[in-house]
UniProtKB/Swiss-Prot annotation:
Residues 234-243 have a biased composition (Pro residues). The lineage of its organism: Eukaryota, Fungi, Dikarya, Basidiomycota, Agaricomycotina. Residues 1-388 form the SMP-LTD domain. Belongs to the MDM12 family. HAMAP family: Mdm12 (MF_03104). Its main location: mitochondrion. It comes from the Eukaryota. This is Mitochondrial distribution and morphology protein 12.
């Protein structure tokens, strides 16, 4: 089955659409050439002009079949790269939502839930030692008298715990004539359990003399209960709302076409690059090089496969033994059989100085490089994949 292609639609009747298509192809080619590997003596390659020409290709459909498994198996690396990009995007979105959930008007404030037995100032640990505090401040007086005043027993109506500060040796055990210290005020913090501060301190002890209470009740140990971040910050959703849903498979069924292409083209393609001399140092000398491709002759058997599940197109060239060109010229290299003719015009040097035109050795070298690249990149088992 043969296909008739109206090649003239690429240039007529709307020339503006043709210009837009040419510009998009130039941008695509420049992006691919920027990432492509090139020899050390070839500088950056840039496409400056592109024209489809007037001669169209002859295309024959040889077969339609199922997609080769090798295309999907060989594209696993691309799948892993896409999945990794998607996971990275999801992680960034979750981090963004988590940071937004933790923002509040109290940013910069630091609150700590302190146990009722610990000090309210400083970070030093606290251990209740009433005898140590009494003798530290009034040791000589009470050792002479041989007894403790009633105000230092737990039976005192206004009994309070002694608070030992690391920055001062003063004891804060209240005397009978002292004014009672202000009650401990804990700022209102989201997630704070009111039951931790609602009970009075004296409720933890019986109203008994010091000699009995000190020997019977164990000494409380300091405990700090930090506020858990999980109690105040909501957990992020399993799938962020900002991420687009995963694309469903295409409704177009998967298929594979075997095509025979014969194209004597008169397209025009202009490239700019440079010849670099890296001796005795890197970029020791560079000569501007302008290449203009004015036509080529391509004869190839092409396999084009479409994967509806992944929405991708795979393209490769096969060396079919049934091809007439293969039977006639078995001794000709594959690259030369595929690309039998490539017309190139070259210019070396600066336009405002001395210019060498149509240098045969340079042109033949470029043709050999193009043929080798065509075989290494597109001839099966190598293939090119386009993600739609």
């Amino acid at each position: 089955m043969s296909l008739d292609i109206n090649w003239s639609l690429l240039s007529q009747p709307d020339e503006s659409a043709t210009d837009q298509l040419s510009e998009s192809l130039i941008a695509l080619l420049n992006a691919q050439l920027a990432e492509a590997h090139r020899p050390s003596f070839i500088g950056p390659i840039t496409v400056t002009a592109f024209d489809f020409g007037n001669a169209g290709p002859d295309l024959e459909v040889k077969d339609i079949r199922d997609v080769w498994r090798v295309f999907d198996q060989g594209d696993d690396e691309g799948d892993f790269a896409e999945e990794e990009k998607q996971r990275e995007k999801e992680r960034e979105e979750r981090d963004k939502l988590r940071n937004e959930a933790l923002k509040s008007s109290l940013d910069g404030e630091r609150y700590e839930l302190v146990d009722r037995y610990s000090s309210t100032e400083g970070t030093s640990s606290f251990e209740y030692q009433p005898e140590y505090d009494i003798h530290e401040q009034h040791g000589d007086d009470y050792r002479i008298r041989g007894r403790r005043p009633l105000s230092y027993t737990f039976g005192y109506p206004h009994d309070r715990l002694a608070v030992h500060r690391s920055s001062s040796s003063r004891s804060f055990i209240p005397f009978p004539f002292d004014h009672p210290p202000p009650a401990l005020h804990i700022p209102s913090t989201p997630g704070l359990n009111p039951s931790l501060v609602s009970h009075p301190i004296s409720a933890r002890f019986s109203r008994r003399p010091m000699s009995i209470a000190a020997s019977a009740a164990p000494r409380p140990t300091p405990r700090r209960r930090p506020i858990e971040p999980s109690s105040t910050s909501p957990s992020p959703p399993a799938h962020p709302a900002g991420l687009p849903p995963k694309a469903s498979s295409s409704s177009i069924p998967s298929l594979q076409l075997h095509l025979r292409l014969s194209h004597a083209s008169d397209l025009h393609l202009t490239l700019l690059t440079s010849l670099q001399v890296n001796y005795p140092s890197a970029l020791f000398m560079a000569l501007p090089l302008k290449l203009s491709i004015t036509g080529f002759q391509l004869n190839a058997d092409i396999v084009m496969a479409y994967s509806g599940e992944k929405n991708r197109v795979h393209l490769t060239i096969v060396d079919d033994e049934s091809n007439p060109a293969h039977k006639e010229d078995k001794q000709i290299p594959l690259g030369q059989r595929l690309l039998s003719n490539l017309q190139i015009e070259s210019e070396i040097g600066h336009a405002d100085a001395h210019v060498l035109r149509n240098v045969g050795k340079v042109e033949r070298f470029i043709v050999d490089v193009v043929r080798k690249t065509l075989v290494d990149e597109l001839v099966f088992p190598n293939f090119h994949t386009v993600a739609l």
